[in-house]
Amino acid sequence: KQSIDARKGGVCFQVALAVSVRRGVKARPDWKPIEEKKAPAFALGTKRMQNSPVVIGAGPCGLFAALMLARQGYAPVVLERGSALAQRQRTVQTFFDGGAFDPQCNVLFGDGGAGAFSDGKLTSRGKDPLGRLVLETLAQHGAPQEILIQNKAHIGTDRLRPVIESI
């Protein structure tokens, strides 16, 4: 992980590395082992589903719920109140330019949720083992690889929208 610590006046660039040390090589006393946080395995149901699971909303949680279901072999149906991202961008831009507000398609409703119009900063919970899975998934769908090592991961809205469409 990369981070910058400027809390105590001076700026300190910090890097945490995972390394393997050969036998016989003494580790320095200030080296600390890194605990790898593995995402828990998802338990699969045992009963066959008669219908596809339904996910309500295509915001971050809805997209990831649908993606996880699809990876497990289900065919989820995602219901979203707003429009697909390309149409949503046009509708929101029209509103920003002084046009009419669309109660069905706006900054809050549509593919990507409210985050599709944010600055692209990711609030990741460092202690949550699923956090790494989320970042890896975003990187697999076109987010910059740097988010995997940044302490404060940042995609940027211009890059976030194609990632959402890819998912």
Language-model region placement:
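Residues forming the flavin
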Residues: 1-117, 121-141, 145-167
